[in-house]
Design a protein with these regions (language model features):
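Substrate-binding/catalytic lobe of Class I Rossmann-like enzymes that use SAM or dcSAM, i.e.
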Residues: 78-192, 200-203
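Residues lining the SAM
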Residues: 44-49
Length: 207
């Protein structure tokens, strides 16, 4: 599910290449327009940052409604440090050139919205240091393929993304911004989650 036609086209190409086109459906659709279900699991990756704090309860409630009892939600999102929202030259740059609709929230705000919708939060994992390394790899890949990136977009757009990713890597490294995965479940009406009781079992280390 994406709002980007370019992402959808690329994803459709990849599922054909990987031989799973008969098992995967790629949609260009707003999450609020999804009404089919119920689903066993939902993974939301890099989307909650574009919802905004005021709409997070609506977002979480809609995902809850799409899941069957026992259904799981994995919410993967960038977060900011707690405290008042501060506008800086860095955030103004991102707002103007990278993510015009982006709005980072502290982790506890996201957890509260998910719990408020009826979910039980089962696990929270920080991937902050991982993402700093990932961003540095992306910058290196961009620089190695610079001419192709410029051809596909423009010199200015390529420079914007190189600057954004390099600066963001420093932000993650310094713990000014974070990246968290929240695993939650919709319990059934008896309170049963159907989830493993230990983290080792959750990660597949125990059977």
């Amino acid at each position: 599910m994406t709002l980007s036609h370019e992402q959808a086209d690329y994803a459709r190409k990849r599922i054909v290449e990987d031989g799973v086109a008969d098992q995967v459906e790629i949609r260009v659709q707003d999450y609020r327009d999804v009404t089919d279900g119920a689903y066993d699991a939902i993974a939301s990756v890099g989307m909650a940052e574009h919802v905004g704090e005021a709409m997070l309860p609506v977002y979480a409630a809609h995902l809850y409604a799409l899941l069957r009892p026992g259904g799981r939600l994995l919410n993967h999102a960038i977060s900011r440090r707690p405290g008042p929202r501060v506008r800086t030259s860095r955030t103004s740059f991102i707002d103007r050139y990278v993510f015009p609709d982006g709005e980072l929230e502290p982790l506890h705000v996201m957890v509260a919205a998910i719990e408020g919708a009826g979910f039980e939060v089962r696990d929270v994992e920080s991937l902050r240091e991982h993402y700093a390394l990932t961003l540095r790899c992306w910058v290196a890949n961009l620089e190695e393929r610079w001419d192709g990136a410029v051809t596909a977009s423009s010199p200015g757009r390529a420079r914007i993304w190189r600057l954004y990713m390099a600066a963001s890597a420093l932000g993650f490294q310094a713990n000014r911004i974070g990246l968290n995965q929240i695993l939650a479940v919709r319990p059934d009406h008896h309170g049963h989650s159907g989830m493993p009781r230990t983290r080792a079992a959750l990660n597949g280390a125990e059977r």
